[in-house]
């Protein structure tokens, strides 16, 4: 990890995921687009997360989060971002691709078949090119209780841990 709060994607320590809460900036959504949220006028709206797993209690609001990732390696990295709160209404991940963003959309307001990864939680694949450094954004909307347990996994470690979990659950 870098002192500035940038998470270095390679190597991730051990097989455990990294909890992203300590690296997140959080801002209340005022109906802005990704273009507006990434602009310099909105940058000061992002505040550090109040806890490793931010908890908003009962709400019907939407929030933006952002976190920096870096891949200092000459090889690409395959990662997974997991939102371990399967009852969120709308979850969006914005991954920088040049000057634009690739948008993943998920949440219980959408059919399961539209998920980027068929999983009980919201999971998004993120491919970091060599020497990547950039900011990823997420938008969350929820009516009801709302907390954000968001994890960053190495893709292989995610799949291995998920297979083991399914095996254990299947044995009951």
Which ranges hold each PLM region?
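Bacterial N-terminal signal peptides
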Residues: 1-5
